[in-house]
Amino acid sequence: GLRGMAVDHTLILVNGKRRHRSSVILWSAGGISDGAQGPDTAVIPGLALKNIEVLRDGAASQYGSDALAGVINFNLKDASEGGSIEVRTGEYSEGDGSMTYVSGNFGMPLGSNGFVNTTFEVGSSDETDRSVQRTDAATLIADGYEGVPQPAMKWGRPNVDDDMKLFINFGADLGNNTEVYGYANTTTRDI
């Protein structure tokens, strides 16, 4: 989170509207974010973003208590024509964590005064492992205790297969100071 506060103390907006919280509750062994439940911004493909606005000051008086640390607004692309394709691949210097992702974004007109902008991303990444055995766990193992995992604490990134994201942003001017707009997304990944 911003300003050293828990992740659910930063308000996340998409196109100026509140983003719902994730179903994941964070736990990091006594960290500042224990019990926090913030939005999952990893479901937004980077290619879908027009820009990101960050308000680093507390904004609780304007937005409520979930903006104590600040506000981050993800603005989605709203082009009604054109597009792009992006391919990313790489790995860590340790020889693990290889990843490959393909993203695409394209805009289409919606009537004479509107747009539909669609972004997809598919890919996968292999796990990374930077674990070392904790000394207290190593002592327990040396003393004959069974059931102590090796390593006791894993550090790294899990294997991610079939990581698929789809974001659709749309809007249209209906005249007479009336506008219809919205966005929809779906995502799935096997971890």
Task: Explain the meaning of each model-derived region.
Residues G1-V24:
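Extracytoplasmic beta-strand/coil segments of soluble accessory domains associated
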